[in-house]
From Swiss-Prot:
InterPro entries: AltA1
Main location: other
The family this protein is said to belong to: Belongs to the ALTA1 family.
Organism: Alternaria alternata
Protein name per UniProt: Major allergen Alt a 1
Length: 157
């Protein structure tokens, strides 16, 4: 019986040793569309967290990737910017945004007409550092560009 047990252990060890280990493919990334008629580049993210937990101002640049002229800064300021709330990108822009600070998630909405509204979303990676207006004051800055693809918002049924 001991021989059978020992032989089984050696056989299992031999099978385990025969299977080559491969390193995980950490450098592989999903392809991201970076240009097109409905693709916009989001860059230059900035924000301020006066108490370290919420934003009171944030903004980012939106630029067309198809050679178009769209290139402007979208921003909002308030005593406390609320998550899950729409803020206008500016007068006559027909664009609004919402930002989820816990995941750095941007939701953008463009009203094209009464019948057509486009939406898009992206994660805006950023880094926050001491802001200088107190121990809990943080200034945040984007660390990478993001690209969004506008899709038509379905009508409610």
């Amino acid at each position: 019986m001991q021989f059978t047990t020992i032989a089984s252990l050696f056989a299992a060890a031999g099978l385990a040793a025969a299977a080559p280990l491969e390193s995980r493919q950490d450098t592989a990334s999903c392809p991201v569309t970076t240009e097109g008629d409905y693709v916009w580049k989001i860059s230059e993210f900035y924000g301020r967290k006066p108490e370290g937990t919420y934003y009171n101002s944030l903004g980012f640049n939106i630029k067309a990737t198809n050679g178009g002229t769209l290139d402007f800064t979208c921003s909002a300021q308030a005593d406390k910017l609320e998550d899950h709330k729409w803020y206008s990108c500016g007068e006559n822009s027909f664009m609004d945004f919402s930002f989820d600070s816990d995941r750095s998630g941007l939701l953008l909405k463009q009203k094209v007409s009464d019948d057509i509204t486009y939406v898009a979303t992206a994660t805006l990676p950023n880094y926050c550092r001491a802001g200088g207006n107190g121990p809990k004051d943080f200034v945040c800055q984007g660390v990478a560009d993001a690209y969004i693809t506008l899709v038509t918002l379905p009508k409610s049924s």
